[in-house]
């Protein structure tokens, strides 16, 4: 009997094993039936089945499975299987979600029946699994059923395998599963309940199935999108036609197949090149593709219909997708070929054979289906009650929420819904009221579509049925019971169809956008806003707006700083309208619906267009209290938020509702009081304006004095005018009696409404040079002074009143003329005319003063010139001046601008002016401001003088309106068809369907790429000005071929030949070309450009101002809907800095740009040879993409705060090309070592004989910068004066302004700091040169070696421009790429003593140092040996360390303040003496270290990225191994007792500048700054024992650049001051270190969810970083945050174990070496970060700064240690770590993919919704316009209201589309960064000794590009965070407003 039992047990075990390993549905059921029969189990006994089965099958394999299932069943929610023991459930559908729901209900103890209409699991399609899904399935024993389940990094499984796993688990838990049974419908309980209580049943096929009598209480629909359960309405999410193709190929599991990489997904939105290549090679056009390797090779792709038609897959094109994809319309053979071709290309033809797998029908497993529409149920559950029987109806899986397949959300969200449904059943079974059950379920369902792997709880072990364990911040009561009453369906409700009840008891939510809006309400609102404005009387929505004044008044009422309303002329309709259109477009993102010309040409504007346009203002500003007239002045006082403009503009498309907080308008005041009070306020403030302007714009004291004199004249004039006004009888009467005196009674503020600083902006029209501008005027185009700049740019033209800047009110006085006017005017008006005569006389005096000053300036300039310059100047004055000037004009005006004389700066057309719309009038004003300080610039002195001469001898020009019109930008030319004609198809385009870009209007469908015909988006396109064509970003690079480049160059050369005698002088004198189009190289985007200056698409920035600064470049931000192109021109007063739009402008200007690119970027002698490479660079990626609202923040920054004459075009071009040119840093190190010393010598010495190319340079300008690229080799082209940079050195500055005040003023002037800190190498030569100025925001100017790059434009365009770098610090893409060599002359020359003493004597006297610094130019003579020593980057001396300590002490003393630039001229004597003493004290120890490099010249040059490499390598090693390695060679370093230990706080992750400045710092700078900090911080790892060769940088330099480039040795004692903001260091570490990948998700930008949700704010993340105890916490999540006090001694704790003594005492390496290593190892182990361990291990014993250099063999010994490190890497790096890193990288890639797919899908849905609303809008518009037969039969008011709602809906969709595009851009950057990181890691895994020059260059290039991407991402994240903060603030304001009205605010 015992034998029989044993045999039976063995047999049962075998059958159970067969059941577990069964691979088909039928086989599983068969094995299960055999098992139950064998063990005498009753499957229908669901309560006891599992326990009986477990007791009878007890093999070791089975026990492991029972353990898994028991652990799951032990959750308290199940109550040991008794929670729902009385509930019967029917589940329709045996898919993964249905089975998972059945398992949960079985655990609850319910009776569960599953019906499945099939008996096979044949779907090989692969599902992506979220981490929690994998964990959940493992908890169910998935690994026991399927051994390959998620092995390694696999995170997907085929549907078939998943179904089998869940199928078997459900059977074991007692779930009753019926196959081949189809559910038909639910049968209600019969009415006759007396005899027998019969509840809810179902009808099945076959009809006689036993289940037909099964009564159930709960029915759950899990039958996919068929959704056979009634009562659930579905919402359709319709995108573009999406045809999905799935293909399964046989997997033979061969070695070749195993090597093929899977494709987690390729999203079109950030990998377009892949799809373009696929289309070009195969003709297959896809939107995405995924490849998973499972039991088959599974491919799924989304194909475009046209591609399928072209390839013959679809035979005929039908609109109906069902007909389109029906079997009769599909060629199966072509479909197979299509799928195979796509799979081959996607896998790079690596799969040896692609034979199709066979599906359950015996056919090749290829399917094509429609994913155009996705559906989601409006509700997740409902309750039915009949005959006292309740039925709970629920949906799960695709029935509930249909997934978009590329996102991989189907299974994950399906499982979550299954848990939520089981929780609902449990609640209902326990007696919870039905409405509460439904309300809770709906609350959870609202969360479901938003779930992502990132925003659900990460502790998967705690997951239970309870939703609180899965959803963070859960609110189960967000839906109230009364809101789901319609879901409880009883007999009494039968008469109400379900559709009706869908709207019953809907909550009365208050939403700003949902409130009732009618056109008459819009009219009333407009009347309120324009009340009190002269000549503005709004009575309707058509004619009242024709003059443009009403539009300007609306803008002025909310943002008075944007428009100078006083200066507007009522009769100038075109200008007024265009001004309003341009300002609204630039500031608010409101695109124009017409043009100024069209408004002027029609008597009555189109009503619908005006309603649509005005509705956007209404939507933007409604609910905003009116601004009181008299309070406007105070809004722009010292505390004004000048930064609002930029952030407002950057985010205007994201959210057009950003009202400024204003106090209510006080209407009680009389008009007279208003006028007089405002006038008096203007007078009282006039005296304050110059000082404030000087402060806000960084103007010099000298200019403040000059402006004070000027303003005295203005002040007197205004006082007279004010006195006159006060004596008049009544302003209102004056308005009636004297209507033509337009300036008298306007309720517009003169100076009061203007931001301070514009007092220096006279509204002058004549071309005579006048007042010098503020010294740093062009630097004001930053956020801080953005408003000021805007006001400056928007002073409209007034040709009749040339010299009256502040007398806007009396402008019309001067326009009055003729006796007839006098006769008809009342006495007061005649008095006004008399007063105007006084004003004229005052003006004449003013003009004479200005002319005299300009002449004196010209004389001074002339006498400072050399012979050639004087000759050129004289020649230009006597007969030859016209030639070059005309040439300049012709070059700079690609469009048909009349070549006005050079002395008169042609006013740009306001319709297209890159500056604010009134730029045409701004030009003269700017011109006046730009003359005086031109003398301070050296770049183009000759041309300046020529212009000055011509200006002084030309009659004043009166710019008539026709002239202005001809000079206006042709943004909206009428010749293009006007607003009602599509630019492409030339057909009618109605208002609702009208899109606009580049001044053209078109249909959405017509907006296509000229090459590939892909539909473009208004937020992302490229435009060719010449051809008038639009391109996608991929094809824009090809729009100008190399032949056209050659053609341009040929034309340029021919033009130069024709000009005969002028080539040399012209090359030397020429300004920067106005428009640089270098088709690809010039493509950049102005991150740093101010939002207040958009570039207009058609306007040529080419007009050369006579007084313009030589290298001024206009950087303007494109309007929200457009791309940017590079326009490099002598901008207007430098206020528009580097307009960047992706355009190819005229051939002339492009050619000029190419020819001048060398001089633009720097004196590159190979500019001509390098130019052809520019357009041939690889296709653009992210930098080209322009997005609607955050264009400035998404892409490469543009330098705005360069020095007075620095070319602001340089950084933009440089970064633009850098991303395209992988070879941009070729030869950078070789060039540096070969050129930097000679270049520095030249920089420090005056030119002995200036070459012809530098003829225009001032004698004080060293020739090194004009021809420094290749010594002795110069070309005219490459050394034009534009390359000279004015650094305001004493030798070159005419205003006696020292650099320090300049920078201090500049610090005050700029509202935000520079975007990217500049890298400055630690080379001893460079470190000892004081050439790196750091502005208070930490901005550094470029180092000299970067200028010396000799590979032409390509080198000059290098983004980071770190032609030299040091092991210790790595280049971060810089903002100001080039070090002006005047600063070399000032700073580097000043440090000649430092250089020479470091290289030779090692000492210098303080007097000598001071003297040499004052000399400015002194030649440095070095021997070859000394040069070699200086250029050896490993050469460090004791002197450096002492100097660095000194610098650190200095830095520590001023820790809380902004870091002031320390110029040589301002370095205090005390500091010099202290430095001298330090050097003397260490002089004796310097020699051995200095000799070390020469003793080890044999090894190959080290990789510039070796520090990062070794840091990451160490992070791969276990901490113990790293500890052993380091401790094997203890370092002998001592800290002399007598030396201070200022280094303990030397390095800190902090912003530069005060808290105020810090708050304004751009996020981009932080990323790059912290990037530099990180790699310096990581540096100890790289040279484990080379510290004896390493010395910190020069103390003076250190004091400036410390926060940007911390020294290696400072790492061990890094501290985090409480005030510091640890911004983006953790982010960067996560991006660059391998360690982080295994420890948690990325922070920063990566957590932007596709739905616009953020899991955790970036600010909170930074706060956490601050609170971490030490640097190790940067690599770990802060689970235990220390008290605030722990923030300061961040690293000191970490270092204390290294040395038992205090930091100030002597550390004895002999006693602390090994112990310290062990202690640090222990500490690092606690931190859990091997990277931190390695960092501290290296720097631990070396924490004391000073080394013991007595051992001459230390260098070689340390080299041995490094060699050992490299050799042991391959041996010690565990495979598991590599696997883990690979897995984490793949997971991150998958996250990005799914986000991208979601964004892509949502974009398509938005596009469809837009199309639908446009169709409806056009229909309504036709009716309203009377174009249909039934037009007169409908109520116009009702139609207009309906149409208006459609307009608002379209506006919202456009904003949403913009936000999606921004998210796509962020993902693109993230993906690009990840790929760069992986590539960099692969490069660094190569042994150092095996690397050649190319490897080093590639590493450098990759790193530079990665830093740029990091910076862009960080900037974007910060911008989005700011936007969210604003939105929250606005929402709070709105809620307060609603609550104040006594309303209840409920959210639905």
Swiss-Prot record:
Keywords: Actin-binding, Cytoplasm, FAD, Flavoprotein, LIM domain, Metal-binding, Monooxygenase, NADP, Nucleus, Oxidoreductase, Phosphoprotein, Zinc
Signal peptide location: none
Catalytic activity: L-methionyl-[F-actin] + NADPH + O2 + H(+) = L-methionyl-(R)-S-oxide-[F-actin] + NADP(+) + H2O
Region of interest (Disordered), residue spans: 664-709, 753-776, 891-923, 1045-1134, 1146-1185, 1233-1298, 1478-1505, 1519-1622, 1672-1726, 1739-1767
Family: Belongs to the Mical family.
Description of its domains: The C-terminal RAB-binding domain (RBD) (1796-1945), also described as bivalent Mical/EHBP Rab binding (bMERB) domain, mediates binding to predominantly RAB8A, RAB10, RAB13 and RAB15 (in their GTP-bound forms).
Protein name (database record): [F-actin]-monooxygenase MICAL2
Gene source species: Rattus norvegicus
């Amino acid at each position: 009997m015992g034998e029989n039992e044993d045999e039976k047990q063995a047999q049962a075990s075998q059958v159970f094993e067969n059941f577990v390993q069964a691979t088909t549905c039928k086989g599983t059921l068969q094995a299960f039936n055999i098992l139950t029969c064998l063990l005498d189990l009753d499957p229908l006994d669901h309560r006891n089945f599992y326990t009986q089965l477990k007791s009878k099958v007890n093999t070791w394999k089975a026990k492991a499975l029972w353990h898994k299932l028991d652990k799951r069943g032990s959750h308290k929610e199940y109550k040991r299987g008794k929670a729902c023991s009385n509930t019967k459930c029917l589940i329709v559908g045996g898919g993964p979600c249905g089975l998972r729901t059945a398992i949960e209900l079985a655990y609850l103890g319910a009776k569960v029946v599953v019906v499945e209409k099939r008996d096979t699991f044949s779907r090989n399609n692969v599902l992506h699994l979220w981490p929690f899904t994998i964990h959940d399935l493992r908890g169910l024993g998935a690994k026991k059923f399927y051994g390959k389940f998620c092995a390694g990094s696999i995170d997907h499984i085929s549907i078939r395998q998943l179904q089998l796993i869940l199928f078997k688990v459900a059977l074991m838990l007692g779930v009753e599963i019926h196959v081949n049974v189809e559910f038909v419908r639910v049968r209600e309980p019969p009415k006759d309940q007396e005899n027998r209580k019969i509840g809810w049943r179902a009808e099945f096929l076959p009809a006689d199935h036993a289940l037909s009598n099964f009564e159930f209480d709960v029915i759950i629909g899990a039958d996919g999108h068929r959704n056979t359960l009634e009562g659930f309405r579905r919402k359709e999410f319709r995108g573009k036609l999406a045809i999905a193709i799935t293909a399964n190929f046989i997997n033979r599991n061969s070695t070749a197949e195993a090597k093929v990489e899977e494709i987690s997904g390729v999203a079109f939105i950030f990998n377009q090149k892949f799809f373009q290549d696929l289309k070009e090679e195969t003709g297959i056009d896809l939107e995405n593709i995924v490849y998973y390797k499972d039991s088959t090779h599974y491919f799924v792709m989304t194909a475009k219909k046209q591609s399928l038609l072209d390839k013959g897959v679809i035979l005929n094109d039908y609109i109906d997708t069902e007909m389109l994809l029906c079997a009769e319309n599909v060629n199966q053979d072509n479909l197979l070929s299509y799928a195979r071709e796509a799979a081959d290309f996607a896998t790079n033809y690596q799969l040896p054979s692609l034979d199709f797998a066979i599906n359950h029908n015996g056919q090749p497993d290829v399917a094509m289906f429609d994913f155009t529409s996705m559906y989601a149920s409006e509700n997740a559950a409902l309750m039915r009650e009949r005959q006292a029987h309740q039925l709970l109806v629920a949906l799960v899986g695709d029935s509930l929420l249909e997934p978009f397949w590329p996102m991989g959300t189907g299974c994950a969200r399906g499982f979550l819904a299954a848990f939520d449904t089981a929780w609902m059943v449990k609640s209902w079974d326990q007696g919870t009221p039905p409405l509460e059950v439904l309300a809770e379920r709906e609350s959870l369902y609202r969360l479901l579509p938003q779930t992502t792997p990132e925003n659900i709880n990460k502790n998967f072990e705690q997951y239970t049925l309870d939703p609180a364990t899965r959803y963070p911040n859960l609110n189960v009561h967000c839906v109230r019971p009364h809101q789901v009453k319609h879901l409880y369906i009883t007999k009494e409700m039968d008469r109400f169809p379900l559709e009706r009840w869908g709207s019953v008891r809907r909550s009365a939510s208050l939403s700003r956008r949902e409130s009732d809006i009618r056109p008459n309400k819009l009219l009333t609102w407009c009347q309120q806003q324009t009340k009190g404005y002269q000549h503005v009387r709004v009575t309707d929505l058509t004619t009242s707006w024709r003059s443009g004044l009403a539009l300007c008044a609306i803008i002025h009422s909310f943002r008075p700083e944007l428009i100078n309303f006083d200066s507007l002329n009522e009769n100038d309709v075109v200008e007024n309208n265009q001004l309003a259109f341009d300002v609204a477009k630039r500031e608010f993102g409101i695109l124009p619906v017409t043009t100024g010309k069209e408004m002027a040409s029609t008597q009555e504007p189109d009503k619908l267009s005006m309603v649509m346009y005005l509705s956007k203002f209404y939507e933007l500003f409604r609910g905003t209290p009116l601004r009181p007239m008299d309070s406007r002045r105070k809004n722009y006082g010292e505390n004004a938020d000048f930064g609002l403009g930029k952030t407002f503009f950057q985010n205007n498309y994201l959210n057009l509702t950003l009202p400024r907080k204003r106090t209510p308008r006080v209407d009680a005041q009389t008009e007279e009081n208003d006028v007089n009070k405002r006038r008096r306020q203007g007078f009282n403030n006039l005296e304050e304006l110059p000082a404030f302007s000087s402060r806000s714009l960084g103007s010099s004291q000298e200019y403040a004095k000059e402006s004070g004199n000027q303003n005295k004249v203005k002040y007197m004039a205004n006082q007279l005018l004010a006195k006159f006004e006060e004596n008049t009888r009544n302003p209102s009467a004056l308005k009636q009696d004297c209507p033509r005196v337009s300036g008298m009674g306007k309720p517009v503020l003169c100076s009061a409404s203007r931001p301070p600083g514009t007092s220096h902006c006279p509204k002058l029209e004549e071309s005579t040079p006048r007042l010098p501008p503020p010294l740093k005027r062009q630097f004001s185009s930053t956020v801080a002074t953005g408003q000021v700049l805007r006001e400056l740019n928007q002073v409209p033209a007034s040709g009749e009143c040339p010299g009256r800047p502040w007398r806007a009110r009396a402008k019309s006085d001067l326009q009055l003329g003729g006796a007839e006017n006098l006769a008809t005017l009342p006495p007061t008006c005649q008095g006004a005319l008399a007063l105007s005569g006084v004003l004229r006389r005052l003006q004449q005096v003013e003009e004479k003063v200005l002319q005299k000053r300009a002449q004196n300036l010209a004389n001074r300039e002339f006498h400072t010139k050399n012979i050639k310059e004087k000759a050129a100047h004289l020649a230009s004055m006597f007969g030859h001046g016209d030639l070059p000037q005309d040439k300049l004009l012709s070059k700079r005006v690609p469009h048909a601008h009349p070549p006005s004389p050079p002395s008169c700066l042609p006013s740009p057309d306001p319709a297209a002016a890159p500056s604010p719309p009134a730029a045409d009038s701004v030009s003269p004003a700017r011109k006046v401001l730009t003359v005086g300080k031109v003398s301070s610039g050296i770049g183009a002195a000759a041309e300046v003088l020529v212009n000055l001469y011509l200006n002084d001898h030309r009659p004043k020009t009166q710019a008539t309106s026709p002239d202005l019109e001809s000079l206006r930008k042709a943004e909206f030319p009428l010749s293009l068809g006007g607003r009602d004609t599509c630019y492409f198809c030339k057909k009618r385009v109605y208002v609702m369907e009208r899109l606009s870009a580049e001044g053209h209007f078109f249909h959405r469908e017509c907006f296509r790429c000229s090459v590939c015909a892909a539909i473009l988006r208004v937020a992302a396109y490229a435009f060719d000005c010449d051809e008038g064509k639009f391109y996608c970003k991929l094809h824009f690079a090809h729009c100008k071929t190399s032949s056209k480049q050659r053609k341009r160059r040929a034309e340029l050369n021919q033009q130069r030949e024709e000009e005969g005698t002028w080539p040399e002088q012209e090359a030397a004198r020429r300004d920067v070309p106005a428009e640089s189009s270098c088709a690809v190289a010039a493509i950049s985007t102005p991150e740093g450009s101010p939002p207040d200056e958009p570039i207009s698409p058609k306007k040529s920035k080419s007009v050369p101002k006579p007084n313009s600064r030589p290298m001024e470049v206009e950087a303007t931000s494109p309007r929200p809907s457009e791309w940017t192109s590079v326009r490099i021109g002598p901008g207007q007063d430098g206020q528009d800095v580097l307009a960047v739009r992706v355009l190819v402008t005229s051939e002339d200007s492009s050619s000029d740009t190419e020819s001048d690119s060398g001089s633009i970027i720097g004196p590159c002698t190979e500019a001509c040879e390098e130019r052809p490479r520019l357009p041939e660079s690889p296709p653009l990626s992210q930098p080209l993409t322009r997005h609607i609202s955050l264009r400035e923040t998404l892409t490469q920054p543009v330098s705005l705060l360069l020095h007075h004459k620095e070319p602001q075009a340089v950084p933009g071009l440089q970064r633009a090309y850098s991303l395209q040119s992988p070879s941009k840093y070729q030869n950078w190190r070789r060039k540096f070592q070969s050129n930097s010393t000679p270049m520095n010598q030249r920089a420090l010495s005056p030119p002995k004989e200036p070459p012809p190319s530098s003829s225009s340079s001032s004698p004080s300008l060293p020739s090194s910068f004009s021809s420094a690229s290749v010594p002795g080799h110069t070309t005219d082209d490459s050394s034009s004066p534009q390359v000279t940079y004015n650094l305001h050195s004493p030798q070159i500055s005419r205003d006696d302004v020292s650099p320090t005040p300049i920078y201090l003023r500049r610090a005050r002037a700029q509202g935000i700091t520079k975007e990217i800190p500049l890298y400055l190498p630690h080379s001893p030569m460079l470190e000892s040169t004081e050439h790196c100025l750091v502005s208070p925001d930490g901005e550094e100017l470029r180092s000299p070696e970067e200028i010396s790059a000799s590979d032409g434009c390509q080198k000059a365009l290098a983004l980071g421009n770190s032609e030299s770098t040091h092991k210790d610090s790595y280049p971060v893409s810089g903002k100001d790429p080039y070090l002006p060599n005047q600063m070399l002359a000032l700073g580097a020359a000043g440090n000649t003593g430092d250089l020479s003493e470091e290289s030779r004597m090692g000492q210098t006297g303080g007097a000598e140092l001071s003297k040499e610094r004052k000399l400015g130019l002194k030649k440095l003579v070095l021997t070859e040996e000394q040069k070699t020593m200086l250029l050896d980057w490993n050469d460090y001396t004791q002197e450096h360390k002492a100097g660095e300590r000194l610098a650190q002490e200095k830095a520590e003393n001023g820790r809380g303040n902004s870091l002031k630039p320390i110029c040589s001229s301002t370095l205090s004597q005390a500091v010099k003496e202290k430095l001298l003493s330090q050097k003397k004290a260490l002089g004796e120890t310097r020699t051995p270290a200095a000799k070390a490099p020469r003793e080890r010249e044999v090894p190959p040059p080290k990789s510039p990225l070796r520090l990062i490499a070794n840091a990451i390598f160490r992070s791969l090693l276990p901490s113990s191994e790293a500890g052993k390695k380091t401790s094997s060679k203890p370092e002998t370093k001592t800290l002399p007792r007598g030396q201070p230990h200022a280094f303990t706080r030397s390095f800190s992750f902090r912003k530069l500048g005060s808290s105020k400045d810090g708050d304004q710092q751009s996020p981009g700078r932080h990323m790059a700054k912290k990037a530099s900090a990180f790699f310096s911080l990581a540096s100890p790892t790289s040279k484990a024992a080379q510290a004896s060769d390493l010395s910190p940088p020069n103390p003076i330099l250190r004091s400036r650049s410390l926060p940007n480039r911390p020294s290696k040795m400072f790492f061990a004692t890094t501290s985090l001051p409480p005030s510091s903001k640890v911004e983006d260091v953790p982010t960067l570490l996560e991006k660059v270190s391998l360690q982080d990948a295994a420890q948690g998700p990325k922070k920063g930008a990566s957590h932007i969810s596709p739905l616009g949700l953020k899991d955790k704010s970036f600010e909170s993340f930074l706060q956490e970083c601050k609170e971490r105890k030490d640097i190790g916490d940067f690599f770990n999540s802060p689970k235990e945050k220390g008290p605030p006090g722990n923030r300061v001694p961040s690293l000191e704790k970490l270092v204390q174990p290294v040395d038992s003594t205090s930091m100030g005492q002597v550390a004895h390496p002999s006693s602390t070496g090994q112990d310290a290593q062990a202690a640090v190892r222990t500490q690092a182990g606690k931190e859990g970060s091997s990277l931190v361990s390695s960092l501290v291990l290296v720097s631990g014993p070396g924490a004391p700064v000073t080394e013991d250099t007595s051992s001459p063999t230390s260098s070689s010994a340390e080299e041995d240690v490094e060699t050992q490190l490299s050799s042991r890497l391959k041996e010690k790096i565990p495979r598991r770590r590599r696997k883990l890193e690979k897995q984490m990288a793949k997971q991150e890639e998958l996250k990005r993919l799914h986000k991208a797919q979601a964004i892509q899908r949502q974009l398509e849905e938005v596009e469809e919704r837009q199309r639908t609303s446009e169709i409806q809008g056009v229909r309504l518009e036709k009716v309203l316009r009377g174009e249909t037969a039934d037009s007169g039969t409908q109520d116009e008011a009702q139609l207009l209201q309906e149409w208006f709602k459609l307009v608002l809906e379209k506006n919202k969709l456009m904003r949403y589309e913009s936000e999606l595009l921004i998210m796509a851009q962020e993902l693109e950057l993230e993906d690009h960064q990840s790929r760069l990181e992986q590539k960099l890691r692969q490069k660094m895994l190569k042994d150092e000794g095996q690397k050649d020059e190319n490897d080093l260059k590639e590493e450098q290039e990759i790193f530079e590009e990665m830093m740029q991407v990091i910076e862009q991402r960080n900037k974007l994240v910060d911008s989005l965070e700011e936007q969210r903060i604003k939105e929250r603030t606005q929402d709070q304001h709105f809620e307060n407003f609603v609550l104040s009205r006594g309303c209840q605010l409920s959210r639905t």
